[in-house]
Amino acid sequence: MSSSINILSTKLGQNIYAQTPPSQTLTLTNHLLQKNHDTLHIFFRNLNGHNHLVHNLLTRLVLGATPEQLQTAYDDDLPTQRAMPPLVPSIVERLSDNSYFESQITQIDQYTNFLRFFEAEIDRRDSWKDVVIEYVFSRSPIAEKILPLMYDGAFHSIIHLGLGVEFEQPGIIAEALAQAAAHDSFGTDYFFLTAEKRAAGRNEEGETLVNLLQKIRDTPKLVEAGRVQGLIGTMKMRKSILVNAADEIIDIASRFKVTEETLARKTAEMLNLCAYLAGASQRTKDGYEPKIDFFFMHCVTSSIFFSILGRQDWISMRDRVRLVEWKGRLDLMWYALCGVPELDFEFVRTYRGERTGTMSWKELFAIVNEQHDDGHVAKFVRALKNGQEVCGQFEDGEEFMVKGDMWLRIARMAYETTIETNMQNRWVVMAGMDGAWKDFKVQSSD
């Protein structure tokens, strides 16, 4: 049954960075994931309040967390959660009608009904892959709404889908589909589809993401829209960028192009760009503490799942190309949304933290699992390890800014800058905005 969570030691994906978990660890993980599935809303608040329990538990699991660490992670995250909306069986039945289904997309109070509908569809077809293909990749009117929503709200639904696919869990896949269907839209569908049409009209091969960052910096109208005050994240996309500089960002984003022949390299390029944005968006030269941007962190944490989805031969090559193309384009959008920060390459290249020093990946995984966090740091570190593995063969390319041990340096930075912090000062939010740094001024020792 797709409503049952059953993580198996034989189905932990390819990005496991610890020994196979013992049976008691898997038993506890399944118990906690089932409680989450059966009782908790996928949104802890209506606007971009994403329940991270699945992300947190599964990531820590493959980084080697003990049962005690997993229970602590669950307990830390639980107080912010809320109960699922009520189930309405008659609505679940009506969702089989495509026109009715389409009318309910973006309605957050329909999450439980969407969840039960997708569970029933998976059980009826005895194939979660067929359901994902129809509702995400078929290019039907419904799929053309669901796929953009997978990226909305800082990539949370596609992270959830990626985890479900990685661990082969129909129940988690149903959660991801329901989350995307119920998610508010911030204009990603317009952005993606318009950029896609514009790219189709271009004959040239496309440009690198690093070069396109420079085009954003060199476009005053886009910089101004990205630095508007009073709007955060996706709300800035909907109310500023797509209102005041839509043509400019679409023109630039459409220049990132992926083909079947370039898919592997362009996936690596995207992973690399995300790490570069997260590590290099600093103001240490101006006397501020090192910090990682909250939204660039999400660009990184989601990046690993484009490696995972890219390995799925049941997804057509055409759709795997589209996945990466859209991800790179939205990463460019996020650079604008975060206020077009200056990027300090040298800081990343030479970074060394007081606590983490020369710590290895294995040592870092161990202390991250001890950290009281909602899973963002663990996800970030795991995604960077994947990035290092994927990008190694391409690092000679000029578009690959992050090379060698810089991956580990950025991972150490994530732990170093978040330990002994609270949720309000763990990350800098929109690193290109002057006001974002006001609480991170280095205090004089005089």
From Swiss-Prot:
One of its GO terms (biological process) is monodictyphenone biosynthetic process. It is an enzyme of class 1 (oxidoreductase). One of its GO terms (molecular function) is oxidoreductase activity. It comes from the Eukaryota. Its EC number is 1.-.-.-. Disruption phenotype: Impairs the production of monodictyphenone, but still enables the synthesis of intermediates until emodin. Results in major accumulation of chrysophanol and its 6-hydroxymethyl shunt product aloe-emodin. Belongs to the AflY oxidoreductase family. This is Baeyer-Villiger oxidase mdpL.
